[in-house]
Amino acid sequence: MNSNPLSNLDDEGRSKIDRMFNGCEEIVGIGHVANVISGSSSHSGGNQLNAYIGLEPSGKAHLGWMVLAETIDNLLAEKVNVTVLLADWHAWVNDKFSRDMEKISLAADYMSEVFRVLLNFPEEGDGPGQLRFIRASEMMDSGKYWERVLR
């Protein structure tokens, strides 16, 4: 049995993965990505690849944001839908901005605007190659969220 998840991909599929993860040291779920590129269903049931990145709004932009933006840009270019979770409740739990949710919310606004600029204002939405920002507080306000947590 071959343990290399990329072994079943053709050259085009391997090139796509190389472009998506250029510069990345570790890729979690590469087997799933390779399977979807090969035609299998994604976790959501279709053929759309989705990436989720959770970030705590906790301060000013720094060099690391540019590195992350480059990877996000690579994913968007390969038609991956990228969701950036602005983990505002995590910032609150971790005592950022003295647990002032108004300041944390302002930091989340700042963070999303900086990433829009770094990514040259990509199209936003739920489709292929689109970017979406969502706050943990928005998700937690959803009845679906709590239904899932309590099950």
Please give the residue ranges for each predicted region.
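Glycine-rich, histidine-containing beta strand-loop boundary motifs that form or position
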Residues: L55, V84-D88, R135-S137
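Short, flexible active-site-proximal loops enriched in glycine and acidic residues
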Residues: E78-W89, L119-G125
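Divalent-metal (Mg2+/Mn2+/Ca2+)-assisted nucleotide/phosphate chemistry catalytic cores
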Residues: N94, D100-R151
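Non-catalytic terminal extensions that flank enzyme cores
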Residues: M1-S58, D126
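Structured alpha-helical segments in the cores of large, soluble enzyme domains
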Residues: I30-V36, D73-V80, A108-S112
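Short connector loops at secondary-structure junctions
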Residues: L85-R99
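Structural preference for beta-strand elements that scaffold enzyme active sites
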Residues: N50, N81-T83, R132
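Histidine-anchored nucleotide/phosphate-binding helix
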Residues: L63-V84
